[in-house]
Design a protein with these regions (language model features):
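Long, contiguous binding/interaction regions
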Residues: 1-341
């Protein structure tokens, strides 16, 4: 099975398209596919989603970190979203033919490459020494809290030879994690204080919805107030049920959700439960989703055809040039990689 790793790096630039384009260009020269680029001027942040073979993804992320180092200066950066680095957060996700342990090894190699640029690195998520460690404690106080030295209890895993954050690029949090749902909800009819109370009520950290992280933010450039949310453990949760619970808190306080947006990509497996609720399907069956079945069919055909070619090349022996035989052996090795549990795309 062909291994596919997803990367969802967050960069502290959401207003200058030329800088974001330069970052995306640095990623695109590698053998990866860029799936989405989301820029937000209020957050002053961009999220790039791309997939590829782990080695290509690793190289693309280190090159993107170098462009961010050259083009982003946190000393003049101000946005409503917390940040500690030019390349702020760098998660990788095993989406096909990989175990989480493979993603952790990729994250470690990426972090080492970023540290070689002179940027200190913290591990988080499954890549942390204590797997599952979150981002919130690392980002407390933002970039400014690291400028004068390492805060108590927050020493980077890779200090890059420094005793404080890089003066312009800060630090980078590198992690491995399962798929999550990142989405924002625009709220009308409430003030900032009321929305902050709702964020406190719904997030897991304060005893709310399991797996949910939430921030109440003012977004003046786009107008209004926003709940910025991440839902973790989505394979075991119904995002639509989470939305209804969040909406219930907002309406109970006298407001309403005017619209929402997804940041990055959303798997079919997360859309289906919402459709089931809204359409009141009597026999919900995810296997009947056409897009998922077509994807599976195309992938099976591709792997079958590739296996046929590889077997022919390896069986032909000396009749085939040595470099082609070497490539076939490499592909044969990749094809034996075990699939990851809970695969999503």
């Amino acid at each position: 099975m062909i291994p596919v790793l997803e990367a969802v790096p967050n960069f502290s630039e959401g207003r200058d398209r030329t800088i974001v384009d330069a970052i995306v260009d640095a990623i695109s020269v590698h053998d990866v596919e860029v799936l989405d680029v989301s820029m937000d001027p209020d957050h002053h942040r961009s999220v790039v989603t791309f997939i590829g073979h782990p080695a290509a993804v690793e190289g693309a992320l280190v090159d993107a970190a170098e462009v961010a180092l050259e083009r982003i200066d946190l000393r003049s950066h101000a946005g409503v979203h917390p940040r500690v680095g030019a390349l702020d957060v760098c998660p990788v996700v095993p989406v096909h033919g990989l175990e989480m342990s493979d993603a952790v090894q990729s994250a470690r190699r990426i972090g080492e490459g970023i540290a070689e640029l002179g940027i200190p690195v913290f591990w988080y998520g499954e890549a942390a020494d204590e797997p599952g460690s979150g981002l919130a404690p690392l980002r407390k106080g933002g970039f400014e809290s690291f400028v004068g030295g390492w805060p108590s209890g927050r020493i980077p895993d890779l200090a890059a030879g420094r005793t404080a954050a890089h003066p312009t690029a800060g630090i980078t949090c590198v992690g491995a994690r399962p798929v999550l749902l990142a989405w924002n909800a625009w709220v009308e009819g409430l003030d900032r204080e009321a929305l902050a109370e709702i964020a406190r009520l719904i997030r897991e950290r304060d005893g709310g919805i399991p797996g949910l992280r939430a921030l109440a933010l003012e977004v003046p450039r786009q107008g209004g107030l926003q709940l910025s949310m991440n839902l973790e453990g989505v394979q075991a949760r119904d995002p639509f049920d989470v939305f209804l619970r969040v909406e219930g808190h907002v309406e109970a306080a006298g407001g309403h959700i005017s619209r929402t947006e997804v940041i990055g990509m959303i798997p079919d497996t997360l859309v289906f439960p919402a459709a089931t609720h809204r359409l009141r399907l009597s026999e919900p069956d995810p296997s009947r989703m056409l897009s998922a079945r077509v994807q599976r069919h195309a992938l099976d055909r591709t792997e079958r055809d590739l296996r046929t070619v590889v077997e022919w090349v390896l069986g032909a022996g000396s009749e085939v040039p040595v470099d082609i035989r070497d490539a076939a052996r490499l592909l044969a090795g990749r094809a034996t990689t075990k699939p990851s549990p809970g695969e999503d795309a």
